From Swiss-Prot:
GO cellular component: nucleus
GO molecular function: DNA-binding transcription factor activity; DNA-binding transcription factor activity, RNA polymerase II-specific; RNA polymerase II cis-regulatory region sequence-specific DNA binding
Keywords for the protein's UniProt record, in alphabetical order: Developmental protein, DNA-binding, Homeobox, Nucleus, Transcription, Transcription regulation
Protein family: Belongs to the Abd-B homeobox family.
Protein name: Homeobox protein Hox-A9
Chief place where the protein resides: nucleus
UniProt cross-references to Gene3D superfamilies, sorted A to Z: Homeodomain-like
Claim: Electron transport is one of the keywords in the record: no
Gene: HOXA9
Any one GO BP annotation for this protein: proximal/distal pattern formation
Residue ranges, annotated region (Disordered): 52-95
A Pfam short name: Homeodomain
Length: 169
């Protein structure tokens, strides 16, 4: 039903919108912090459209065209009849969930050097202290999170190998 979608995307007649202030229409939705609004490229671990999906330095109008071009070509016949495209505010979380893209990074395999060093470290110690994790990450040009997850996965692999070995005997 188009009326529910339109209520989020089109401004309510007679209402004013002030950037940075929540409006009465967005009950229970936490507004984004002002620091991450414009020009800041930060990474979020959420699965909604964030400013990190948009190119830095481009004006907000260009960003809007790039991220939402043709998004309503089949759903919004009323706007097409008028010859205008609906304006979608990239700072409005209520509109963004309709066009959410995953912000997950593509899978990037470790280099042979990184794998070798991680395996050596694992043979020496299956668990890393926070300081050692920081050091390994810095030496291998990885994030601490990547090192932490690699060690978690390696421990699970070890557990599986041991279980299979016990089953075979």
């Amino acid at each position: 039903d188009g009326r529910y979608m339109r209520s989020w995307l089109e401004p309510v007649p007679g209402s004013l919108s002030f950037p940075g202030l929540p409006t009465s229409r967005h009950y229970g939705i936490k507004p984004e912090p002002l620091a991450a609004r414009r020009g800041d490229c930060t990474t979020f671990d959420t699965h909604t459209l964030s400013l990190s999906d948009l190119p830095c330095g481009s004006p907000p109008v260009d960003r809007d065209k790039q991220s939402h071009e043709g998004a309503f070509s089949e759903n919004n016949g009323e706007s097409e009849a008028n010859g205008e495209k609906p304006h979608i505010d990239p700072n409005n979380p209520a509109a963004n969930w309709l066009h959410a893209r995953s912000t997950r990074k593509k899978r990037c395999p470790y280099t042979k050097h990184q794998t070798l060093e991680l395996e050596k470290e694992f043979l020496f110690n299956m668990y890393l202290t926070r300081d050692r994790r920081y050091e390994v990450a810095r030496l291998l040009n990885l994030t601490e999170r990547q090192v932490k997850i690699w060690f978690q996965n390696r421990r699970m692999k070890m557990k599986k190998i041991n279980k299979d070995r016990a089953k075979d005997e």
